[in-house]
Amino acid sequence: MSVHEEDQLQDAQLQEDDVVEIVEDDGDIPMDEDDDDNDKYDAEIIIGGPGPGEEDLMMNEEDEGEQRADNSWGVNALHNQQQSIFTISLHPAFPNPPIAISGGEDDAGFIFCPIPADSETSASSSFFSADTFPPTKLTGHTDSVVAAGWSFDGEMVATGGMDGKVIVWQRVKPQESTDEASVDEWKNWSMIQELETGTEIIWLQWHPKGNVIAAGCEDATVWLWNLPSGNTLNVLSSHTMTSTAGLFPPPNGRQLLTASLDSSLILWDPRDPNPVWKSSIFMPANSPELDPAEHGITALAVSPNGQIAAVGGSSGKVKLISMAKGDVLATRLVGHAEGESVEALLFVDLLNGAAGGNKGVVLVSAGTDGKAFVWDVATGRVRAELQHDEPITTLAGHPHPQLHLVTTASADSTLKTWDIRTGALIATHTGHMGVVNGVAIAPAREGKVVVSAGDEGVSLIWKV
């Protein structure tokens, strides 16, 4: 490993969170009933309901079913018809340039512009639109593309497939460029690496500050590569079943946190094949046999200050973990139906760091029971309950100053944007005719653009 590569993965010092108690996981710890000092967001449990202008739409939804009117801003149908799009991600500087990457069941990925033609946005972005920007088809996979994402600076993209490959593409820069992105500057891409793992890719994660990729695999291994060289930094192998999730924890991303169907959560120094710590989250010490359908970890998130991890399980449980040592914390988060898996987790700092610590921090969990819960991290209280008619597949948060907005995607063919402070439904996004597998939120312009990945092979876009 070069000195430059080591610098990208330098170890971080994480401080133990002293707000909540550490306990042994005996399943009998009561929820903390102390009053929450964060009065601004303290309220009784709220079942998500209609927001302004949503009442009529909700009244009509039951009758319309699959015939809901399409209220999207535009549609992109690049993947093969009726073959699922599994993953969607927007450029980190979207809308400059306003491009996205998708991956699907047709063994392909696409770099494309989701902005419809003849729109005000395309005119303000050097005439970027679905008509003027030629999509780039990302080939090379021999099975479904299930993961895709951008490097931290948006100069590279990576796709991960069920064929065991991670393929990396890099932008071919023109000789002359401008501050305002143009079609010519972003239309040319070149494959630079085809990385082999020999087993199905489950998840893929770019480092937030460097050109490093981590990928979790079906055979329980986790791979790390440096780009653009393609050098293997490490192969981590302390899980015993499929690695289901992984991320570089905030605030600096110097460590790697991974989860598995074997119920293990592991913190790594990416340069070291040995774990910093390893914890069994949902597997009781006296359990006779590991059952991934009961004990497996299916979702993972870390708080903005890097002190607490949240893990969701295949049996509907959610637990908080100290990032310092991997201990289960006392706060209980009980709400999802037993036997229904937790599909997505998201920490949101509603005060944007103004209060310090975990004051104002909430956790949003979404599951196959069709519900999303907004939890107060310090007390475990449910602040709001959000509902879909079918399982929720994923969710995404909106950037500052709209941190209070979260958009959920569902098997009921809709996406919904919520104000998680109150549980109010801000908008219902319709147009899909099947399961919505993915959602991406514009990282700029106040997060007012929502882009989806659909089971019927199309991607839709809405303005919030």
Predicted regions: what they are:
Residues 206-325, 329-330:
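Solenoidal tandem-repeat scaffolds enriched in leucines and small polar residues
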Residues 109-114, 166-171, 222-226, 246, ...:
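WD40-repeat beta-propellers
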Residues 103-106, 160-163, 216-219, 259-262, ...:
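Conserved strand-to-loop turn within each blade of WD40 beta-propeller repeats
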Residues 89-97, 148-154, 160, 204-211, ...:
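Loop/turn segments within WD40 beta-propeller blades
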Residues 58-87, 127-135, 187-189:
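A short helix->beta-strand "capping" segment at the edge of beta-propeller domains
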Residues 77-108:
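Beta-strand-rich domains and repeat architectures in extracellular enzymes and scaffolds
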Residues 1-73:
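Acidic, serine/threonine-rich intrinsically disordered low-complexity regions
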Residues 78-85, 131, 138-145, 194-201, ...:
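WD40/WD-repeat beta-propeller blade N-cap
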